[in-house]
Amino acid sequence: MKHLRPQFPLILAIYCFCMLQIPSSGFPQPLADPSDGLDIVQLEQLAYCLSQWAPLSRQPKDNQDIYKRFLFHYSRTQEATHPVKTGFPPVHPLMHLAAKLANRRMKRILQRGSGTAAVDFTKKDHTATWGRPFFLFRPRNGRNIEDEAQIQW
């Protein structure tokens, strides 16, 4: 919706005055003089033009209020169509998996002192012939699993 330009009410007022067709000699004359030739119809037209000026001057504010109401109505969160678990905020299901993996990793770190973590996290597929522990994240800086095993912290 385009806003009206600020000079539009001024142009409307000039148009209304031009429509009155006031005969003059170039000098301003008082309107109270009955010899001007102004009749009631022309004065009513002038009053109508000026009465339309006020709503046009506040129209940008009305448009802004309508826009704010629209944003308020449509920016609210919609009600869920299915029940949502209260423990989790509404996120992608893979994000729930990432949280579970992080919990598992923390348990492994806590159990490291007891020596059971390596047993729980060994590869169990056909490619793992040695039963090496797998990493949730790959080793960095070009290190291998064997390099990690040799470094005893």
From Swiss-Prot:
GO terms for biological process: neuropeptide signaling pathway. Residues 27-69, 70-105, 106-108, 144-153 form a propeptide. It is found in: Secreted. The modification Asparagine amide is found at residue 141. InterPro entries: Neuromedin-U_amidation-site, NmS. Keywords: Amidation, Cleavage on pair of basic residues, Neuropeptide, Secreted, Signal. One of its GO terms (cellular component) is extracellular region. Residues 1-26 form the signal peptide. Implicated in the regulation of circadian rhythms through autocrine and/or paracrine actions. Belongs to the NmU family. This is Neuromedin-S. It comes from Homo sapiens (Human). The gene is NMS.
